[in-house]
Design a protein with these regions (language model features):
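Extreme N-terminus of proteins, especially the signal/transit-peptide cleavage junction
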Residues: 1-3, 346-347
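N-terminal Rossmann-like or analogous alpha/beta NTP/dinucleotide-binding catalytic cores
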Residues: 2-139, 257, 296-298, 306
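A generic structural motif
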Residues: 11, 149-150, 208
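Internal, conserved structured core segments that host functional sites
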Residues: 113-115, 119-169, 173, 194-195
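Conserved nucleotide- and phosphate/pyrophosphate-binding catalytic cores
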Residues: 157, 163-353
Length: 353
């Protein structure tokens, strides 16, 4: 069986460091590992419209922004197909067929859907498209016969729902769809990076993000304003590491060489944590260290992005080429689905028998 990756992002804004440690960095590693036959990376504009139907311009403006972020982090269009979801109409038809395999009550039990309905204040009036987007995601994944879906922890319920749809379809119509597996980040801190305000999730809509394209002074300003341990009022006070976003970010970003370069009095992060917990280490010092670490990580990404910004026609051609490949692959899967469901009427020689 071919090893195939499908992953992607909603174009509702520029991508941030939560995307980077949660998925983007891993995508680049997998892309360069040589272990996968095909990689599809989707700019999920149709999904973004499920809660932005009254503001399509917002989605339109961010198509290229997301593509630029992909190219800046190292996604190689020679190794991965970057495509736009709405340019693959077969996905909509697959979603329609899968809707018959999922109950309303099952969608209501999806923890990710429940949390996002609450976050977006949709409790009293839920758009149908938004409510059913786990089914749309299942269409996205199965259309490309994905075996692996790199994603953050918050996407686990979505993958489970997709697997249920695959199991049900294959049980009813015969073995047709490929069963996908989720691939979570190995670093626990990368599963869900908190916002700079200490909230559970970094989110564009909450305004608590550090963007991959942020300028150095903006990054520093955001880091220096980060939430820490509210009980750590004086330098000499013992501080808490658990639930402290600054240390969560250091878990996700810092490497031993960063200590040698930026904070040589400590050999590693464990030593820094021990000192903070003991007392005698101020928040300003650890924030300055985090700033140095993140500037080192984000500078080459920002520079590559600025280079691609000068080549926008080439970026558009990359999206066109990727979308053409994606459409061809999805069309083949849809043909198999229609055949299994026995609704490929004009391809069926037994129709009149």
């Amino acid at each position: 069986m071919k090893q195939i990756i499908l992953t992607g992002d909603r174009p509702t804004g520029r991508l941030h460091v939560g995307h980077y440690v949660g998925s983007l960095k891993e995508r680049v590693r997998l892309q360069n590992s040589g272990k996968f036959d095909e990689i599809y990376i989707m700019i999920a504009d149709a999904q973004a419209l499920t809660d932005n139907a009254d503001n399509p311009e917002k989605v339109r403006q961010n198509i290229l922004q997301v593509a630029l972020d992909y190219l800046a982090v190292g996604i190689d269009p020679a190794k991965a197909h970057i495509f736009i979801q709405s340019m693959v109409p077969e996905l909509t038809e697959l979603s329609f067929y899968y809707m018959n395999l999922v109950t309303v009550s099952r969608l209501q039990r999806n923890p990710t859907v429940k949390a996002e309905i609450q976050q977006k204040n949709f409790e009293t009036s839920i758009p149908v498209g938004f409510f059913t987007y786990p089914i749309s995601q299942a269409a996205d994944i199965t259309a490309f016969r994905a075996t692996t879906v790199p994603a953050g922890e918050d996407q686990m319920p979505m993958l489970e729902q997709c697997r249920e749809i695959v199991h049900k379809f294959n049980a009813v119509y015969g073995e047709t769809l490929t069963m996908p597996e989720i691939l979570l980040p190995q670093n626990a801190a990368c599963l869900r990076l908190p916002g700079i305000d200490g909230r559970a999730k970094m989110s564009k809509s909450l305004g608590n993000c550090i963007y991959l394209s942020d300028e150095p002074e903006d990054i520093k300003k955001k880091i220096m304003s980060m939430y820490t341990d509210p009980g750590h009022l004086r330098v000499q006070d013992p501080g808490k590491v658990e639930g402290n976003p600054v240390f969560t970010y250091l878990d996700a970003f810092s490497r031993p060489e960063h200590f040698a370069e930026f904070l040589p009095e400590y050999q590693n992060l464990d030593e820094l944590k021990t000192h903070y917990q003991r007392g005698g280490l101020g928040d300003v010092k650890i924030k300055k260290f985090l700033n140095s670490v993140m500037q080192a990580e984000l500078e080459p990404i920002r520079n590559r992005r600025k280079e691609w910004e000068q080549r926008l026609p080439e970026v558009v051609e990359i999206l066109k080429a990727g979308s053409a490949v994606a459409e061809k692959t999805a069309a083949a899967t849809l043909a198999d689905v229609r055949k299994s469901m026995k609704i490929d009427y004009f391809e069926d020689d037994n129709l009149l028998k």
